Amino acid sequence: MSLVPGQHCSPSHTRLHLTSPITMGTEPATQNTEFSKGSLIYGVTSPQRGHSQHSEASQGPLSLDKPLQLPPIFLEGEKGESSVQNEQEGEPSLQSPSLELQSPAWPRHAGVAQEPLKVSSSYLSDTQSSESHVSSVQHPRPEEGSHASLSSGYAGDKEGSDISLVGSHRRVRLNRRLNTQAASNQTSQLGSIDPPSSLKSRLTGPAHSTKQTGGKE
């Protein structure tokens, strides 16, 4: 069996090295082949053993570090969280009496709040009455505004509608009186003028006198 140095073996992919030279012959060749087989077997198996030892060595510190380092951290974290939860659970128990004490105080505050509402409503009624009084002073009643409109002579407000109607009737009466006075004056002037019969008599009077005088002549 001849082996070339540096040849790769397909199943294990390991490099095989021969330490002793191969000689031609029967006995030495068999010895060398046996020795080479043993070396090959040792070379093939030795990396596996080394790998297994390396894996065991690599796994050893990890298996020792895990139970020593990691669990205390988790335990401390769990203890801290549990203590925080206990504190948070203890705070509502302390605050609950204050809430229970504050609950019966609501009706008192409500009663106190209702009293100012009553006061404010009375105050509002007073202010409304005062505002109504001011508005009545600023806007007088129609009866009171009649004198003011008559004195001022302005009859454009809605409140003084009756006054404006009364004033219009008075003006109409005055106009009628003026018209009647003018008509009476005209009639008096016409009455002062002589009637047509008198005019005729005046015209005919001189004619008769002339005739009479002519007949006498």
UniProtKB/Swiss-Prot annotation:
Start and end residues of each stretch annotated as Disordered: 1-217
Bias (Low complexity): 91-104, 128-139
Distribution of this protein across tissues and organs: Preferentially expressed in teratocarcinoma rather than in normal testis.
Polar residues bias spans: 20-36, 45-61, 177-191, 207-217
Short name of any one Pfam family annotated for the protein: DUF4694
Name this polypeptide is given: Protein TNT
Species whose genome carries this gene: Homo sapiens (Human)
Encoding gene, per UniProt annotation: C16orf82
